[in-house]
Amino acid sequence: MKVLSVSSEVFPLIKTGGLADVSGALPIALKAFGVETKTLLPGYPAVMKVIRDPVVRLEFPDLLGERATVLEVDHEGLDLLVLDAPAYYDRPGGPYLDPLGKDYPDNWRRFAALSLAASEIGAGLLPGWRPDLVHTHDWQAALTSVYMRYYPTPELPSVLTIHNIAFQGQFGSEIFPGLRLPDHAFAIDGVEYYGTTGFLKGGLQTAHAITTVSPTYADEILTPEFGMGLEGVIATRIDDLHGIVNGIDTDVWNPATDPVVHTHYGPTTLKNREENRRSIAEFFHLDNDDAPIFCVISRLTWQKGMDIVANVADRIVAMGGKLVVLGSGEAALEGALLASASRNPGRIGVSIGYNEPMSHLMQAGCDAIIIPSRFEPCGLTQLYALRYGCVPIVARTGGLNDTVIDANHAALAAKVATGIQFSPVTETGMLQAIRRAMHFYADRKLWTQLQKQGMKSDVSWEKSAERYAALYSSLVSKGM
């Protein structure tokens, strides 16, 4: 089977979040199930800088008003189609934001162009290759199925994956003519959304199947609390909605071989984590004692529950724990966490910014990780933690709920528990979970059991890729 994947970011070329990890790992995992994937992504400067010996495969003299070229290149196991359109993508800043952190005002055109190019490739415009199905990711690629629906070309089966429904790609009605869609596409069953132009909304109306990145999140987005205004649209597509949890690259995330981990280990050699633990204490200037080290590796935002972490940091120390934080985000939260570190020298350490090697070492050396997200479509951090024997303490939401088995009495007795869940996401809820963790930590046999069971969890892409392959086959066989 041939699949065209369309994404605004793909790891390892360009990444701002989990979307890139999925769009970079899933095509490789799908190979085992006979799925040949070409991935279309924008030619940002970061992408153009690293690709080698690309081949020109297609030219668009007028892609929504600008010239564009499709380049094909193999990169670290990925078959990439790079949309080289300098007018859209060759600019400073990130994929979506300018150097001042503001949305590019023409983001609607930049990603409509990506979707239009994808629809043309889906229609067979790429010489010698035509996909059987198109798989699009988030609002930036969601118009692909809209173009395929309204353009006079054969319509292919399509899948739209929602990685985070909070990001919807909503723009004013005045941009609609620039999309070059027929007038009747600006309607309730098209892209019109309360008088605006909704990219994700249009994709939800026109894709043949919709997936989210965990089963719980698929249920949550049907509710007003999590649906972000689109729950009504999604409810009309409930029979086409599937929750498929993400996996991780278990070669990159492997404590037995990870090059940045100071001492390698596995489920039977957990004592080797001690050297990594000492490295963490040294980096964050912590006292060298046996108190449990809790860590946070996160964007410092309200959605991630970081205001709660900031508010309880002193109390974690008072309870006998230590805390280390790696991340960046809202200035007020950064300041609050730095202040807590100043008040608690040797017990709290904070590093503002993101450091990929340090994130690996923290998973390999800290005792537990706190993930108190108010909503979390899937989450990858807890999967890394399970893999590394860093016991996850998670809010009972989204993919966190699907991937961490709470250490309740029944799960402990059955020896299947892998972490600690808590709800509601409040200071009291989090502190109760941390208190439970410290109780378990005091019983080293029980704590080791939690670590080992977590490390045995299958967090690879294999099961997820198998489900995607089955979904693809179902749609293609139905001729959707």
Swiss-Prot record:
Q: What is this protein called?
A: Glycogen synthase
Membership in a protein family: Belongs to the glycosyltransferase 1 family. Bacterial/plant glycogen synthase subfamily.
Biological process annotations from GO: glycogen biosynthetic process
- Which EC main class describes this enzyme? transferase
- Gene that encodes the chain: glgA
Function, as annotated:
Synthesizes alpha-1,4-glucan chains using ADP-glucose.
Look up keyword Cell division and say if it applies: no
Any one Gene Ontology cellular component term annotated for this protein: cytosol
Q: Which biological pathway?
A: Glycan biosynthesis; glycogen biosynthesis
Keywords linked to the UniProt accession? Glycogen biosynthesis, Glycosyltransferase, Transferase
EC number assigned by the record: 2.4.1.21
What is the catalytic activity of this protein? [(1->4)-alpha-D-glucosyl](n) + ADP-alpha-D-glucose = [(1->4)-alpha-D-glucosyl](n+1) + ADP + H(+)
Q: Which Gene3D superfamilies match?
A: Glycogen Phosphorylase B
Q: Name one GO molecular function term.
A: alpha-1,4-glucan glucosyltransferase (UDP-glucose donor) activity
Q: Which SUPFAM superfamilies match?
A: UDP-Glycosyltransferase/glycogen phosphorylase
Q: Does the keyword Transport apply?
A: no
